Amino acid sequence: MMRLIIHWTAGTNAVSDLDRQHYHFIIDGGGRVHEGTFRPEDNLDVRDGKYAAHTLNCNTGSIGVAVAAMAGAVERPFNAGRFPITLIQVEALARLCARLCTQYDILVTRETVLSHAEVQPTLKIAQRGKWDIAWLPGMAKPDDPVKVGDFIRAKISGNMQPVAIPPKPAEPAWSWFATALAKIFDQLTRKWRL
């Protein structure tokens, strides 16, 4: 998989059958993660029509993750609707995306982990005025999607587990003796060759 694209469903805080068809993972209002109908790998090749269609002209190689929220939301004048994104969903989103990035070896960058609203300005793929996710709980109104995306990416990065580098095996206590002996042997054989 090449990237992860984050959405809101524009529905209630409950996961619907339609949500399952369009996203690989959906987070309900309580922060629970639900699997979609299709696996992320189904989006490796979308020519067969059996894949999660979540982003116009950008589904191939893309994992679609959504928060179930924002039914009735209006961008201008802003109204979050009756089912706004919750803080619980934002935290669950960061954990899920961190796990997926680790599992699929996706680096957290603006080009590889982005919201639907960032696809057009970042990847230059037209998206018909999508603004998910340009607003999060605590914001008075939507903001620049890349700025909001940077906040989400920072949360995702903060949830990623550091890669443990195994310690160098300890050398046996007598290794210094073997090293010294090898140097002496090397010096003696050089003298004998001359």
What are these regions (language model features)?
Residues 68-194:
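Basic/polar, cationic surfaces and motifs that engage anionic cell-wall
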